[in-house]
UniProtKB/Swiss-Prot annotation:
Pfam families: SmpB. Residues 133-157 are annotated as: Disordered. This is SsrA-binding protein. InterPro entries: SmpB, SsrA-bd_prot, SsrA-bd_prot_CS. It comes from Bradyrhizobium sp. (strain ORS 278). Required for rescue of stalled ribosomes mediated by trans-translation. Binds to transfer-messenger RNA (tmRNA), required for stable association of tmRNA with ribosomes. tmRNA and SmpB together mimic tRNA shape, replacing the anticodon stem-loop with SmpB. tmRNA is encoded by the ssrA gene; the 2 termini fold to resemble tRNA(Ala) and it encodes a 'tag peptide', a short internal open reading frame. During trans-translation Ala-aminoacylated tmRNA acts like a tRNA, entering the A-site of stalled ribosomes, displacing the stalled mRNA. GO terms for molecular function: RNA binding. The lineage of its organism: Bacteria, Pseudomonadati, Pseudomonadota, Alphaproteobacteria, Hyphomicrobiales. The gene is smpB. It is found in: Cytoplasm. PROSITE patterns: SSRP. Its main location: cytoplasm. One of its GO terms (biological process) is trans-translation. It comes from the Bacteria. One of its GO terms (cellular component) is cytosol.
Length: 157
């Protein structure tokens, strides 16, 4: 049963392949600057962040290649689906993320796009390092073994 004190968030888009393709070091919550039609489209649940990433430009962090489709009920004031979107972070957070990307060869990957309890659009951003093919195989073996172990324990018990 859900706890009443738990924050109520509505997940709009999730990057499910990110945990398989990347080794996640750290996560950070960032606000995202959206236009009105983008917010309505995201609430509709059609947006995807699977192929997107974050990059630094002119001392700011931008979300690149996130697909938020056009809002059908909007007319000529609609938005461009794959435009770069500014992420709202504190200066210390931006400097930390830019340092990790430049010095350590990390990548900024969005994990989840959601609305918090106040109705604000937020993006869970991960500082991650790309996995090699053998690392992916190893994590797949661990996952399969966990499933098999669960099956064996259920059959036995």
């Amino acid at each position: 049963m859900a706890n009443k004190n738990e924050p109520k968030i509505t997940v709009a888009a999730e990057n499910r392949k990110a945990r398989f393709n990347y080794a996640i070091e750290d996560t950070i919550e960032a606000g995202i600057a959206l236009t009105g039609t983008e917010v309505k489209s995201v609430r509709g649940g059609k947006s995807t962040i699977a192929e997107s990433y974050a990059d630094s430009r002119d001392g700011e962090i931008w979300l690149i290649n996130a697909n938020i489709p056009e809002y059908l009920q909007a007319n000529r004031f609609n938005h461009e689906p794959k435009r770069p979107r500014k992420l709202l972070l504190h200066r210390k957070q931006i400097n930390k993320l830019m340092g990790a990307v430049e010095r350590e060869g990390m990548t900024l990957i969005p994990l989840k796009l959601y609305f918090n309890e106040r109705g604000r659009a937020k993006l869970l951003l991960a500082v991650a390092k790309g996995k090699k093919l053998h690392d992916k195989r190893e994590s797949e073996k661990k996952r399969d073994w966990g499933r098999e172990k669960g099956r064996l324990l259920r059959a036995r018990g």
